[in-house]
Amino acid sequence: MADITTEELEELENEVVSKDDNIKTMQEFVSPESLYQELIASVKKYHPSTDISLIEKAYKTADTAHKGQVRKSGEAYIIHPLCVAIILAELELDKETIVAGLLHDVVEDTVMTVEEIASEFSEEIALLVDGVTKLGQLSYDADKVEVQAENLRKMFLAMAKDIRVILIKLADRLHNMRTLKYMTPEKQKEKARETMDIYAPIAQRLGISKIKIELDDLSLKYLEPEAYYDLVEKVALRKSVRDDYVQSLVKEVSKHIENAGIKAQIDGRAKHFFSIYKKMVNQHKTLDQIYDLFAIRIIVDNVKDCYAALGVIHEMYKPIPGRFKDYIAMPKPNMYQSLHTTPVSYTHLRAHETRSNL
């Protein structure tokens, strides 16, 4: 890897967990009260009329229960449940889930009982907290083969009678991964492997791509640090910058597709580090041989429009030879049908892949 200063590495590292990505980077020793206000603002954003009194009660209860406890970072323990609750609010979950997120560690780490939670809050919230506590008791052996990891994932899902229990556990793991740097190197690798093998796949199964992507990238950071930082350095652009670039492409493509009279839904994304790394490993390629660091998806109603959209793209950008795939003429075994092409973009940034799907 080329020479790079510590300051530059830290700046590049922040692109994975960035406020620009609407993912909160919690500064060390941040005020619990400021985080609480952030939580309330987040809840009010998607549920303006919600009664916050129960959330406030849960915050005060958790703060009292965890009084005197500190995390490995040295910050007050209450910071963790607050951050978990904020992640849940970003998923726009109901008030009861937010409350359970604030209380999720009180049974395991304090003298408070499930019965007391049921009495002071509700049976519903008590069951959520109890479910999270029981999931935390599942142990994972990183040396297990994949089939055993899959069995543990199934057990994880089966034990949670309420899907909200899993969502709280995912939020809990995400914040723990964001603050993993305070653990020993051995514990970092252990937690990262468990996250990649168990938690990220579960997030994917539940369709929570935002959490799945961040869990993957954070796991890669600790499991393969050289590869991770090499990607961070070589990709060179903050995710916010890459996302802005993709959105500019989406806007440009949308204009041309509309002018062609094609009805379509168009979106795009910048591929995350783990996705790029996995492709490099599986296909035995270097980063310079990975052409699709960006992807734009065009969804149309019929085959005719699919080919027409492809024609529009090829008029806009020159296609890279050998990168066109016709899954309409030859569908995948699961009957997936689309057209894939990789054109050269009009800026200095790397090429992007465009998919026109039925």
Can you name each region flagged by the protein language model?
Residues 2-350, 356:
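Active-site helical microenvironments for divalent-metal-assisted chemistry
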